[in-house]
Regions:
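Active-site loop-to-helix "anion-binding N-cap" substructures in soluble metabolic enzymes
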Residues: 1-233
Length: 233
């Protein structure tokens, strides 16, 4: 939960000239900011996302946001299974349901997966991550619309960053566990204390298709620098 509506709109306005020629650029503001941010980005190639969605359809689900509501606001992508949501008890099955709901209304889900520091240091690390991904709706026909995002929980908002080579190897193992028919269709991102000074090292790796940026995206100049470094190194 960051920025007021006015601040979010100003940030979006500052991103109107961000370089989108070689990379896909997405912003995912809080629900309350989406309409104003969408207007600020109108006419640009910047995609609009949301930070979460309900696994339910319309009905008596007070406080929830239905996928249809996001589609009405011209949202393109929606993040599901973020580590902060999983930390509040969200389970793999719920994440999968949210991804399916998003796809049903034409939204593109970004499905997050990641491990705690305890799991990171154990022999079960890769199997744990594969289990999370296996719960995703990877048997559906429109797999090219699904993006996965590896975000080690111990690197989210802590200033700690995974080693790029290690992240690449882990993502490569997860990709290899997918059905051969879909491996090349699914984009897998890295997220975890990404900034302009380290992004080039991640996107240069074979198995990392992009990055999911957190706190560094709250400053327009830094966000633009991340895009620039990801594009040109």
């Amino acid at each position: 939960m960051n920025t007021t509506v006015d601040e979010g709109e100003a940030l979006a306005e500052a991103l109107r000239d961000v370089d989108t020629e070689s990379v896909d650029v997405l912003v995912a503001p809080p629900f309350t900011h989406i309409d104003r941010v969408a207007r600020a980005l109108e006419g640009t190639e910047v995609f609009l996302g949301a930070q979460n969605v309900s696994e339910d359809t319309y009905g008596a689900h007070t406080g929830e946001i239905a996928a249809e509501m996001l589609a009405d606001l011209s949202v393109d992508y929606v993040i599901v299974g973020h580590s902060e949501c999983r930390g509040r008890g969200e389970e793999d099955a719920t994440v999968a349901k949210k991804a399916v709901r998003a796809l049903e209304v034409g939204l593109l889900p970004i499905i997050c997966f990641g491990e705690s520091e305890e799991v990171y240091g154990s022999a079960e690390r890769v199997d744990f991550l594969k289990k999370q991904v296996k719960a995703s709706p990877t048997d559906m026909k429109d797999l090219d619309k699904i993006t996965l995002a590896y975000e080690p929980i111990w690197a989210i908002g802590t200033g700690k960053t995974a080693d790029a080579t290690d992240a690449d190897e882990v993502i490569g193992s997860v990709r290899a566990s997918l059905d051969p028919a879909i491996r090349g269709k699914v984009r897998i991102l890295y997220g975890g204390s990404v900034k302009s000074s380290n992004v080039a090292g991640f996107v240069a790796k074979e198995n990392i298709d992009g990055v999911l940026v957190g706190g560094a995206s709250l400053k327009a100049d830094e966000f633009k620098a991340i895009v620039r470094e990801a594009t040109h190194g």
